[in-house]
């Protein structure tokens, strides 16, 4: 699946929510969204998921296979939920890199983890998932939670993640996906396009950012499509686990 389409002037375009925009503008528009929501990102995660995001992330950690001494890269790591847990798992002989393209999110994550006193083995790096600034065959595990849908060229990002993994290393992609039954799909549509923007307006005074987030979820590849993208990028043994009736899916692949 490609993210590129051609407009009438032959300029490459891609989706930003339901809108079609020049590729060169998407990253800037996504950045504006996350600059806006960074300060209350954790609160909104709890409100909008009813706290379920913590269970989804816990399952991700369980399937990661991360252990003492490992190197872990958490892409789009935002406010540091996964990084904090991985920091404890890898211990003082391991390393966690929390990477995010958005400076505001990275600052919130750094400040939050420093306040918790768990940042001793965590490095904070502002980085683009499509062009990761790390050596080949460097990490034992790479994770990206609720970030891949915001990437312009998803195939490039997945290949970049493959490159930085060691042979036998694991990629875990936690992302909103396609509900597995029609009733849940209808309920989820109402929730996404009515409740999410309303809560965004009430809590952050920003309905538009949460309208974009709802739209971006609908534009993200479904479970089977993302699995195929990971296989085509070069990953082996790609599987996925649906959670909460497919509202969220966790994909896992191994570097040969």
Curated annotation (Swiss-Prot):
SUPFAM superfamilies assigned to the protein according to its UniProt record, in alphabetical order: S-adenosyl-L-methionine-dependent methyltransferases
Stored Pfam families: Ubie_methyltran
Gene3D superfamilies: Vaccinia Virus protein VP39
Record-listed E.C. numbers: 2.1.1.163, 2.1.1.201
Keywords, ordered alphabetically: Menaquinone biosynthesis, Methyltransferase, S-adenosyl-L-methionine, Transferase, Ubiquinone biosynthesis
Record field: catalytic activity: a 2-demethylmenaquinol + S-adenosyl-L-methionine = a menaquinol + S-adenosyl-L-homocysteine + H(+); a 2-methoxy-6-(all-trans-polyprenyl)benzene-1,4-diol + S-adenosyl-L-methionine = a 5-methoxy-2-methyl-3-(all-trans-polyprenyl)benzene-1,4-diol + S-adenosyl-L-homocysteine + H(+)
Cleaved signal peptide residues: none
Taxonomic lineage from the root: Bacteria, Pseudomonadati, Pseudomonadota, Gammaproteobacteria, Pseudomonadales
MF term (GO), any: demethylmenaquinone methyltransferase activity
Coiled-coil positions: none
Recorded family membership: Belongs to the class I-like SAM-binding methyltransferase superfamily. MenG/UbiE family.
Top-level taxon of origin: Bacteria
Group of enzyme by EC: transferase
Record's function text: Methyltransferase required for the conversion of demethylmenaquinol (DMKH2) to menaquinol (MKH2) and the conversion of 2-polyprenyl-6-methoxy-1,4-benzoquinol (DDMQH2) to 2-polyprenyl-3-methyl-6-methoxy-1,4-benzoquinol (DMQH2).
Pathway: Quinol/quinone metabolism; menaquinone biosynthesis; menaquinol from 1,4-dihydroxy-2-naphthoate: step 2/2; Cofactor biosynthesis; ubiquinone biosynthesis
Sequence positions that bind S-adenosyl-L-methionine: 79, 100, 128-129
BP term (GO), one: methylation
Cross-referenced InterPro entries: SAM-dependent_MTases_sf, UbiE/COQ5_MeTrFase, UbiE/COQ5_MeTrFase_CS
UniProt protein name: Ubiquinone/menaquinone biosynthesis C-methyltransferase UbiE
């Amino acid at each position: 699946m490609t993210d590129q389409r051609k407009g009438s002037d032959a300029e490459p375009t891609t989706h930003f929510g339901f809108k079609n925009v020049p590729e060169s503008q998407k990253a800037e528009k996504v950045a504006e969204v996350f600059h806006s929501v960074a300060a209350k990102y954790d609160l909104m995660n709890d409100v909008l998921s009813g706290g379920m995001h913590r269970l989804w992330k816990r399952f991700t950690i369980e399937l990661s296979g991360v252990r003492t001494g490992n190197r872990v890269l958490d892409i789009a790591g935002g406010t540091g939920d996964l990084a904090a847990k991985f920091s404890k798992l890898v211990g003082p002989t391991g390393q966690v890199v929390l990477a995010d393209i958005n400076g505001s999110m990275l600052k919130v994550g750094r400040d939050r983890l420093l306040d918790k006193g768990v940042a001793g083995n965590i490095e904070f790096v502002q980085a683009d998932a499509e062009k990761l600034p790390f050596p080949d065959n460097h990490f034992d595990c790479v994770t990206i939670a609720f970030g891949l849908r915001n990437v312009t060229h998803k195939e490039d990002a997945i290949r970049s993640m493959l490159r930085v993994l060691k042979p036998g290393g694991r990629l875990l992609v936690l992302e909103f996906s396609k509900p597995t039954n029609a009733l849940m799909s209808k309920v989820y549509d109402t929730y996404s396009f009515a409740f999410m923007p309303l809560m965004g307006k009430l809590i952050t005074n920003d309905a538009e950012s949460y309208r974009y987030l709802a739209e971006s979820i609908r534009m993200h590849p479904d479970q089977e499509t993302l699995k195929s993208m990971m296989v085509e990028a070069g990953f082996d043994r790609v599987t996925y686990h649906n959670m909460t009736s497919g509202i969220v899916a966790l994909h896992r692949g191994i570097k040969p």
